[in-house]
Amino acid sequence: MRTIRLLAAAALIFLPAASFGTERFDGNWLTKLTCPPKGNTEGYTWQFPSIIQNSIFHGERGAAGQPGYLSIDGPIAGDGSAKLTANGIVASREYARGVFAHQGESYSYDIKAQFQETTGTGTKGQGLGIVGRTCTFEFTKQSPASPPNAK
């Protein structure tokens, strides 16, 4: 019986710390995606808001279902490592590489990312339709909004 009480006490002490550690990335983030020009394909940089909640990343750019849309999702491990998945719709052949890269076509790729407390970086894997250039990601945690002055 004494062993059970000790285990219960230890669980109460250590569980809050464990959950805090896995949610340390939670908050609003700014995501910057940069794909350099290569060959006849133009480069581009997109910035869009993202959120991490319960150590799950979610970011969206554009209108769902429309050319230029991009959604990024995935879990973040306690050490900050993440394998995120991007799904999008080609905006213009001018900015996309590959045989199937035509306006309105869907694409997807994986992102290998590493998060710190307030910053993160990532690189795009080779995805169908947009192969052949390295795209990079920068993640910056945003400060929480200041509460309004109470009067």
Task: Give the location of each predicted region.
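Bacterial N-terminal signal peptides that target proteins for export
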Residues: 1-8
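Central antiparallel beta-sheet cores of small beta-barrel/beta-sandwich binding domains
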Residues: 23-115, 121-150
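N-terminal signal peptide c-region/cleavage motif recognized by signal peptidases
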Residues: 16-17
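Short, linear, compositionally biased motifs with a strong N-terminal bias
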Residues: 10-13
